[in-house]
Amino acid sequence: LPHTQFMLMSATLGDVTAIAASLEEHTGAACDLVVDAPRPVPLSYDYVTTSLEGTVELAMRRGEAPLYIVHFSQDAALATAQSLANFGIASKEQREAIKEAAKGTSFSTAFGKILKRLLGCGVGVHHAGMLPRYRLLVERLAQQGLLPVICGTDTLGVGINVPIHTVVLTALTKFDGYKMRRLRAREFHQIAGRAGRSGFDTEGMVIAEAPEHEIENAKLMAKAGDDPKKLRKIKKKKAPEGFVTWNKQTFERLIETQPETLKPRLRITHSMVISVVEQGGDARTRVHDLIETSLQTPEEKAKLEVRADEIFATLIDSGVVVRTEVPPAPDAPTDAAPDIDYALTVLSLIHISEPTRLGMIS
């Protein structure tokens, strides 16, 4: 990027000093790093122990729509949308405008028929499992300000421009494909950062729902009031066994914690090596340079070098790649051994600076 003057990066990337240093090294130009730039629309945070329906109702009364209710499963998002559709979310004018804006969209599938009914009530659904035409329709209606509530997954937190005033997190945990775990700071800030519409709002709102057992306990406490006898008799519910829980302190910690530093994930693959070979020249050296100039740790670089050696050997043995012998150096003796070309090739594959490598030529 020698001619690039500005590189704008997401604030959720964490510490980017290593990236700035890499840019300086590759371009030869000084790189000034600007961090902690103020948000155009500041955020307010609230941790609530009301039911989700109650939270939505209160937010609507306070004029904090549109709301995006974040779930961590597609089924949960649809279930909430169907529940809220019975609460009269949209006004008559909004429902008529939605109906007009949705003309031309085919709702022929089973999910499409459900979505059509939900949209007619002012409730949208958004997740990666939807057909593109449905997802784009919801985004378009939201951009036009016609949907007071959208129920979806955390996909909206990644690169989709939909104006939202309030983000409601139904949980601070998610299943990552292996286990249930609490949200990481980067994930939280990506989702929370969707709140607040630049040019419309003076602030955005981020609300986190307490776990179900905590909400039930809050109801029991409210019912008992200030009566000491009733308060003593309360049997507080506990989190289910094996449940990964969270609390207000978890929420506050996520707010205060800076996003984790972005970690490089360079992989050397057969297709990558073949692509480099197709360019001609010393392919192995270019792969080495790619690894060496990456932001991986020294240990990771050593593993990538071993992996590159394995791939080159496999491609050569299978005949996919043919090794061209390196010509003798100009100052090489004329009576050099017949294997000098091979020795030079091997030497080019050995990086003496790596303490984890041992090369031997016989």
Predicted feature locations:
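Conserved helicase ATPase motor motifs in RecA-like P-loop NTPase domains
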Residues: L1-V16
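Loop/turn-to-beta-strand initiation segments
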Residues: H3-M7, P66, L146-P148
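Conserved interdomain linker/interface between the two RecA-like ATPase lobes of SF2 helicase motors
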Residues: T17-S83, G124
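A short, conserved structural fragment
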Residues: I316-P327
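A short beta-strand element within the Helicase C-terminal
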Residues: V149, L156-L172, M205-I207
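Single conserved hydrophobic/aromatic residue that forms the stacking wall/gate
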Residues: I350-S362
